[in-house]
Curated annotation (Swiss-Prot):
Residues 40-44 are annotated as: Interaction with host APOBEC3G. Belongs to the primate lentivirus group Vif protein family. Keywords: AIDS, Host cell membrane, Host cytoplasm, Host membrane, Host-virus interaction, Membrane, Metal-binding, Phosphoprotein, RNA-binding, Ubl conjugation, Ubl conjugation pathway, Virion, Zinc. Homomultimer; in vitro and presumably in vivo. Interacts with viral RNA and Pr55Gag precursor; these interactions mediate Vif incorporation into the virion. Interacts with the viral reverse transcriptase. Forms cullin-5-RING E3 ubiquitin-protein ligase complex (ECS complex) by interacting with host CUL5, RBX2, elongin BC complex (ELOB and ELOC) and CBFB/CBF-beta. Within the ECS complex, Vif interacts directly with host CUL5, ELOC and APOBEC (APOBEC3F and APOBEC3G) substrates. Vif-defective viruses show catastrophic failure in reverse transcription due to APOBEC-induced mutations that initiate a DNA base repair pathway and compromise the structural integrity of the ssDNA. In the absence of Vif, the virion is morphologically abnormal. Signal peptide: none annotated. The gene is vif. This is Virion infectivity factor. Residues 75-114 are annotated as: RNA-binding.
Amino acid sequence: MENRWQVMIVWQVDRMRIRTWKSLVKHHMYISRKAKGWFYRHHYESTHPRISSEVHIPPGDERLVITTYWGLHTGERDWHLGQGVSIEWRKRRYSTQVDPDLADQLIHLYYFDCFSESAIRKPSLGHIVSPRCEYQAGHNKVGSLQYLALAALTTPKKIKPPLPSVKKLTEDRWNKPQKTKGHRGSHTMNGH
């Protein structure tokens, strides 16, 4: 029998970002209780030796599974130390991989109060509307002018610690263009 390969998309992430994300997930599962129904699976509960943890997020009757890996092959950069994250959407026997933006939208849709475009219609129907969005990572586009005007009237409430964002977990913070200060800024940058 020949070997069969299965290819998965794994986002390379540095381990400190993974540790921060895990602690945010645990905080909102056990302390703030905003992540109701979420399930955290430790590395010792998995049979796969490379799985560091799994977070199961059930939006509706399906599941979003965020798996963190360790011991992967290192990448071409120094900080690619063999840590990674995969994001999978499962419903019964069907599963597919999703990108971090879609994962955040699914989490946002099912779990957190939001003052969104539908809030313009809801008060006229007699529904109660939340005056803010608790999970800003779930929005990836600019809203309508009505929405922006209503959002400008409400002051956003800062949540400490922030809610766990899958996009923030997988973003590449190392390859962004470096911002340097002007003439009066950092003296080490301009050689003085």
